[in-house]
Amino acid sequence: MSTKNLLLELFVEELPPKALKKIGEAFAQTLQASLQTQGLLSADSVLTAFASPRRLGVHLTKVLEQADDKTVMQKLMPAAVGIGADGKATPALLKKLAALGADESAVAGLKRESDGKAEVLFFNSVVTGVMLTDGLQKALEETLGKLPIPKVMAYQLADGWETVNFVRPAHGLVALYGADVLNISVLGLHAGNTTHGHRFEAGIDPVYIRDADSYAKQIATEGAVIASFAERRAEIVRQLASAAAEAGSNLTPIEDEALLDEVTGLVERPNVLIGQFEEAFLEVPQECLILTMKANQKYFPLLDSKGGLSNKFLIVSNIRPADASTVIGGNERVVRPRLADAKFFFDQDRKKTLMSRVAGLDKVVYHNKLGTQGERIARVRAIAQAIAGKLGVDAQQADTAAQLAKADLLTDMVGEFPELQGIMGRYYALHDGLPAAVADAIEDHYKPRFAGDELPRNPVGMVVALADKLETLVGLFSIGQVPTGDKDPFALRRHALGIIRMLIEGKLDIGINDLITAAEKPFNGLSAEHRSALLNFIFDRLANALREQGYSAQEIDAVLALQPQRLADVAERLAAVRAFAALPEAASLAAANKRVGNILKKVEGTVAAQVDTALLKEPAEIALNQTLTTVKPQAEAAFARGDYTASLQALAALRNPVDAFFDGVMVNAEDIALRNNRQGLLATLHQAMNQVADISKLAA
């Protein structure tokens, strides 16, 4: 069947810029998927998506005018129900066939097949392929219903009666199959071949689209619009680089993918211009200036070769006037008060020391069940003191940093820009004459804030960051505020991962149980249930992180089953398990370890790992004990020096003695003394085999 190319455009009022990329991709991909499902696209059909502030569009090549007919085999009923004893169709079968548009003449062509229970009648029917107009109508309605729209608007159509719900009011619909207009409608609009270009700079309005393939070129030349989100974004990147080079040889625009996407969603005809502000504003911390330019004005600040902020910035305008000075001047006038506000906040904040603000935290509620920020800081200080003592970090500096960590929450700058919490605390601490290690720790105690974020830059920061995150975890677990499903309002998963990363990447010599013990003391302890839940939560987060790094489920289960306390060793344990699993003895020893564990579980009480050699009677148990006497010290010595691979590989010598033991020795002997001694031998074996990891997890 012949094909043509398809063009669809929905013309709307300005779409949310932050959501435009996602909405545009969803619009194109969902529409394509629906048409594909209906059989209206060729196998090699190519999709081109369009998304600009005022339009969502799709271009598809090789679209069928009608889908191919399909033969569908439909299950009817058991043959015993459909065919009577006389061999003729029963009324029930005839009624079913009539519903499918067939009569008694179709009975002879019915197929009989078993469905595993009985012989069943099947009817082959031909389903006529859907027409493009009908299929596109269905696809468009489905697509609009599935868009990831942040908020929906309700508006009335021109008739004043009908109400429509969509992200923004829609004003036009183009649907072209080749040069033919398709008869579809949606959101109270009927498809045509006219659209509108740039709000201010279109050369022709309306723009009459000749055919599906001319859309992109016509909307660009006649409508002054780059309709493709990707092309418009690339053009902005090109212009930013060009303008930065023009502004100064060593200047580069700040890299911010989210800002770039948002600006791409704001303009249809990008034009990058250079603006500047007074150098006096550079006395303000550059993070403040950068944030106000990006968040409030959507500008791209220019940085020098050392990463320092210059007094120039780039504006992505939506118009291209012959004389851009008015546009530039207007933007410079707008940004100046913003920068002046930032300077005012900075100057005012420095009139009070951070220490003088600490008392004010007693009036800031942290959680109605956990008290104020002041009470929270007291807990963080106590936890930080305990951790600093165990890690040999300057306890006084850790205490000061913990005490001042949240003080900047009461400053004007952080009140205006919450994203600067910690950052401003560092600047104000340095202004107050505090040591750099303390100032850095105040900023860094929030780190790592997200996947890939850097860790605190010094030991004091590491201690306070651990204390802050542990206080949050222990406090919220103590009142039952744990993450459920996708809901994690207090970012506890992120806090747990932050702790894990600091322990592993920082190679901190402290156990996870020691940390929880230190953190629970200011809360007067955790219940056994809450402590166990928190420990499992942390190890679950670690398991997820390790899976993302490519470790197998068996390897992870083997190591984490023991809940190793020093997380800095986890990578070495995993490497040792992987090397052990490659040994020819591994499978047999893993199975044996599993068997030993099952035997010991059935014994009432705890089995002591000790052996009375005088009670060893069978040659196999004597041989196993002798081998254990040699192997166990070797494995323990390697474990003690951190050579986990050698520790596990030493176990290989146990394979034959263990196999012989299970082949020739009755563990549960009738003689109680023999039975207890053999159980003690197995407990000793189990102890030796489960120092680095629970190798039974490697059993098939």
UniProtKB/Swiss-Prot annotation:
Principal localisation: cytoplasm
A Pfam short name: tRNA_synt_2f
One GO biological process term: glycyl-tRNA aminoacylation
GO molecular function, one term: arginine-tRNA ligase activity
Keyword ATP-binding: yes
Enzyme Commission number(s) of this protein: 6.1.1.14
Family, per entry: Belongs to the class-II aminoacyl-tRNA synthetase family.
Subunit organization: Tetramer of two alpha and two beta subunits.
Protein name, per record: Glycine--tRNA ligase beta subunit
